Amino acid sequence: MNFLRKMMKTCRDDESSKPLDPSAPPDDDDLWLPPPEYVPLHEISSKGNTRNFCISGEVKICSPNGYSFKIIRHILRSFESVYSGNRRMIGLVKVVIGLTLSGSPVPEGMNWVYKLRKTLVFQWSNSSGPLEGEELEYSQEITWDDDSEYVGLQIRVNAKQCHIAGRSWCVNMNSRACQLWSDMTLKTQQSEEDEHTSVLIE
């Protein structure tokens, strides 16, 4: 049975239905240490293929019966096969999704909304990444439904290259973000110029 598929359902509230209290945000009920190649990034010393992006990320979770990160992680493990955005920026999108879902959710009707607004520094290998000046406006809904439970993710990522000083994108290895990056098979490698820097290869 195909558990991950696009549905006609949406996360919009039904205006005619009785308002319901959203379920509590999930606990970290599925914690584990990510693979060792996900090393924390420090200040990037290399100037090759490094770009600053002003980022706006949002993940809205719709689940009438509540949700856990076990289900979210299950959905994100198939992210590569359902991603509909610019393939040159899939690595950036994965990073932003992980960082966004590491924040605190805000209730919005029956939904929980995670938001991220930051200026971040990304470094790609020479053959990967966006073109000079390229921007991204990505929006997609991914749903999971097994006839007894429904979870929908509405993902929006806007990224514009900018000259504002930003921070490198990796966070504590033990964080939820690194777990989600591993689930989405984020592809990185260690920089040849800086042993403390990871480089995106997608």
Curated annotation (Swiss-Prot):
Disulfide pattern: none
Region (Disordered): 1-31
Keyword terms of this UniProt record: Host membrane, Host-virus interaction, Membrane, Phosphoprotein, Viral budding, Viral budding via the host ESCRT complexes, Viral envelope protein, Viral matrix protein, Viral release from host cell, Virion
Subcellular location: Virion membrane; Host endomembrane system
Entry's Gene Ontology molecular function annotations: structural constituent of virion
Statement: the UniProt record of this protein carries the keyword Membrane: yes
Membrane-topology annotation of the record: Peripheral membrane protein
Essential for glycoprotein binding as annotated region, ranges: 115-151
Motif stretch (PPXY motif): 35-38
Pfam families (UniProt xref): Rhabdo_M2 (PF04785)
Gene Ontology BP term (one): viral budding via host ESCRT complex
Gene Ontology CC entries for this record: host cell endomembrane system; membrane; viral envelope; virion membrane
Coiled coil: none
InterPro entries tied to this protein: Rhabdo_M (IPR006870), Rhabdovirus_M_sf (IPR038617)
Note in the entry: Most abundant protein in the virion.
Purpose of the protein: Plays a major role in assembly and budding of virion. Completely covers the ribonucleoprotein coil and keep it in condensed bullet-shaped form. Inhibits viral transcription and stimulates replication. Plays a major role in early induction of TRAIL-mediated apoptosis in infected neurons.
Domain notes: Late-budding domains (L domains) are short sequence motifs essential for viral particle budding. They recruit proteins of the host ESCRT machinery (Endosomal Sorting Complex Required for Transport) or ESCRT-associated proteins. Matrix protein contains one L domain: a PPXY motif which potentially interacts with the WW domain 3 of NEDD4 E3 ubiquitin ligase (Potential).
Record-stated family: Belongs to the lyssavirus matrix protein family.
Subunit structure as annotated in this protein's UniProt entry: Homomultimer. Interacts with nucleoprotein and with the cytoplasmic domain of glycoprotein.
Protein name: Matrix protein
Gene field: M
